[in-house]
Every structure is written in C-alpha cells, then in structure tokens.
C-alpha cells in the first residue's frame, strides 16, 4: 500500500547551502520532518550546482513523517540577472532598460531551464526566456 501524503512544501533554498535556519527549519518542523536529514540529502543532491544559486524544491511529506523531494532548475530571473551582471531588474521595465542580454546567453539559460520549460523546441525555449528578460527591463539582442 502506498504511503499517505500529508503535505507538499515548496521552498527556494540556496544550492548546497541548506541549513536548519529559516525558511527551511520552520517549514519542515511544523510537518514533523527530520530537518537535518533533509539538509544533508539536499546538499548532497545539489553539490554539482553552483553554490548559492536559489534552487526551488518541492518536498512531499508522508504520514509516517518520511519525505521525498524534487529539485527544479534555478529561476530564469536569477540566471538572467547573473548573465546581465545585475542585482535587480528594472522597476519600470517598459520605459527604463537596465541591461542587455545576447541570444547566446539566452540559449545557455534555455539549455539550463529546458527540463522545466514546456517549450516544443530550443527556439521556443529561447523566446520564452527572452520574454522573461524583456519583462525584467533587459534589452534582448538577436531574437
């Protein structure tokens, strides 16, 4: 018989830097999950990623207080800010442009995000990422 699911927890945790402090500790503690066990497993799974990049994770908690988790790719906005060398996007993206990204940079981000995108092919994925860039106030070259 399958285990009964009691909760889904969605968090963004820095890759290879999970620790029991907020937001991880309180979110898992209220569901009775072993926090240190999650932190060790998460850090081991995200070891290959660049340390410090926020990584979305969906934790499934079962009735016996066990858990499984699935990591997603880093949000496109974080990757775009990194590619453009910015700390934040534009407060007024349609009037004030704060940086520029090239098609090559967009293709690299699309390859990273491809597993989480619903695009039919790489060109559609690049256009999706380009739309995210424009909504952040970035100029897009070559698309």
Swiss-Prot record:
Q: Mind listing the UniProt keywords for this protein, alphabetically?
A: Methylation, Ribonucleoprotein, Ribosomal protein, RNA-binding, rRNA-binding
Biological process, per Gene Ontology: translation
Gene Ontology terms, MF aspect: large ribosomal subunit rRNA binding; structural constituent of ribosome
Which CDD domains would you find in this protein's record?
Answer: Ribosomal_L11 (cd00349)
Share the record's PTM remark.
One or more lysine residues are methylated.
Q: Looking at the record's lineage, which domain of life comes first?
A: Bacteria
Q: Which GO terms describe its cellular component?
A: cytosolic large ribosomal subunit
InterPro entries recorded: Ribosomal_uL11, Ribosomal_uL11_bac-typ, Ribosomal_uL11_C, Ribosomal_uL11_C_sf, Ribosomal_uL11_CS, Ribosomal_uL11_N, Ribosomal_uL11_N_sf
Q: Which HAMAP family does the entry link to?
A: Ribosomal_uL11
Q: What does this protein do?
A: Forms part of the ribosomal stalk which helps the ribosome interact with GTP-bound translation factors.
Q: Subunit structure, per the record?
A: Part of the ribosomal stalk of the 50S ribosomal subunit. Interacts with L10 and the large rRNA to form the base of the stalk. L10 forms an elongated spine to which L12 dimers bind in a sequential fashion forming a multimeric L10(L12)X complex.
Q: What family is it from?
A: Belongs to the universal ribosomal protein uL11 family.
The molecule here is called Large ribosomal subunit protein uL11
State which gene encodes it.
Answer: rplK
């Amino acid at each position: 018989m399958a285990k009964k699911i009691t909760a889904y927890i969605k968090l963004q945790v820095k890759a290879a830097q999970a620790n029991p402090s907020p937001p991880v500790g309180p979110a898992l503690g209220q569901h009775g999950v072993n926090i240190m066990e999650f932190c060790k497993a998460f850090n081991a799974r995200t070891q290959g990623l660049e340390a410090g990049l926020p990584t979305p994770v969906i934790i499934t908690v079962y009735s016996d207080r066990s858990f499984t988790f699935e990591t997603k790719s880093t949000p496109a906005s974080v990757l775009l800010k990194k590619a453009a060398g910015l700390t934040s996007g534009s407060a007024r993206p349609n009037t004030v442009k704060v940086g520029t990204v090239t098609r090559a940079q967009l293709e690299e981000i699309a390859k990273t995000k491809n597993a989480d995108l619903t695009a039919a092919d790489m060109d559609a994925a690049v256009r999706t990422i380009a739309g995210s860039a424009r909504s952040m106030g970035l100029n897009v070259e070559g698309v």
